[in-house]
């Protein structure tokens, strides 16, 4: 019987979902969200914290600080609670409310950036804030997931070898690009593997990672407003860009079959399907990495008002048409109707963002 004493010791990462019956393409989805942090970011967080401890950078007086759109923040909040560190996560207004509350429940503080940098976007503004905090107080320790080699080494040592073991005949691997830690770790591993693997990076339209123009992005996770320092394009064979509307459709298509995945996973799956529709063959062996699960996206990706306000009422039409209950339930028209009279009732979450108090030097 497995017994653990720290939360990061549990990580079920050898589960795959066969998506052939859902998307009509030969694709296996590697699920990375079955741990107490809920995402693949647990691996990078653990690697970076342990390296900082070995190097003597982290001490009992240290205060961890990191810029995160959500998932790494949760992983660091969990590890900080387990190891007795204080942690300040610097995120922005796109971060899901449930994610912010989860970090707070784990004892961490959250600062929300509400104004994007004109050039670097929200990420640039978050990094500026982190740098200012570090300059103001020497107790702050910034692991810097955007430059820390521990980010990609975690996947060189764990994620990629696991895929190679489970799929010795792998032909193509689809990996989402955020900080590019997962992407670079896997790409470096398979560059040295015994057979060629076509590594496809999946990014969001509006991200500048691969040189595209910056544009509005509302789903946290993949994509970046600043080119990641870890990225080395020489290891990558191809890049697929995904519109956020297609991310939403992929998420809902999976949900209609009982699989609730996060926005990053929806982007990767949509990109993989697009590529396989064009290049796939019946004998191809393809794997995509699912970074996260969907519970933290219930107020955004899976919330009707949020979807329609940002992407229009018809964004999910192709998905709804394919759903067996698409015509069975009428859409609610009166949010205040009496639920006892058979009318569906919906509620709209509060969209106000209230920054939390910040730690001050000497406190």
Predicted feature residues:
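PLP-dependent amino-acid enzyme catalytic core
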Residues: 1-363
């Amino acid at each position: 019987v497995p017994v653990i004493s720290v939360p990061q010791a549990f990580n079920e990462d050898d589960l795959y979902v066969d998506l052939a019956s859902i998307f009509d393409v030969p694709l296996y989805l590697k699920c990375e969200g079955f741990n107490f942090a809920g995402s693949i970011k647990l691996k990078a967080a653990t690697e970076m914290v342990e390296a900082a401890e070995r190097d003597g950078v982290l001490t009992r007086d240290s205060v961890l600080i990191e810029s995160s759109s959500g998932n790494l923040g949760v992983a660091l909040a969990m590890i900080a609670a387990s190891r007795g560190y204080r942690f300040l996560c610097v995120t922005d207004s796109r971060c899901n409310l449930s994610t912010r509350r989860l970090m707070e429940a784990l004892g961490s503080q959250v600062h929300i950036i509400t104004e994007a940098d004109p050039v670097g976007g929200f990420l640039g503004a978050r990094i500026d804030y982190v740098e200012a905090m570090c300059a103001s107080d020497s107790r702050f320790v910034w692991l810097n997931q955007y430059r820390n080699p521990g980010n990609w080494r975690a996947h060189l040592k764990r994620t990629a070898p696991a895929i190679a073991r489970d799929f010795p005949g792998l032909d193509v691997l689809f990996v989402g690009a955020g900080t590019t830690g997962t992407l670079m770790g896997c790409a470096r591993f398979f560059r040295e593997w015994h057979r060629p693997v076509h590594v496809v990076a999946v990014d969001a339209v509006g991200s500048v990672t691969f040189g595209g123009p910056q544009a509005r992005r509302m789903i946290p996770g993949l994509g970046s407003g600043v080119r990641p320092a870890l990225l080395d394009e020489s290891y990558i064979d191809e890049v697929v860009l995904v519109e956020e509307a297609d991310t939403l459709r992929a998420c809902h298509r999976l949900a209609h079959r009982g699989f609730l995945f996060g926005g990053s996973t929806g982007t990767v799956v949509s990109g993989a399907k697009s590529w396989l529709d064009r290049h796939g063959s019946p004998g191809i062996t393809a794997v995509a990495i699912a970074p996260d699960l969907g519970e933290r996206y219930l107020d955004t990706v899976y919330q009707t008002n949020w979807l329609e306000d940002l992407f229009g009422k018809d964004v999910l039409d192709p998905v709804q048409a394919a759903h067996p209950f698409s015509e069975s339930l009428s859409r609610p028209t009166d949010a205040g109707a009496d639920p006892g009279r058979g009318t569906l009732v919906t509620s709209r979450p509060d969209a106000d963002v209230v920054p939390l108090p910040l730690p001050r030097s000497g406190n």
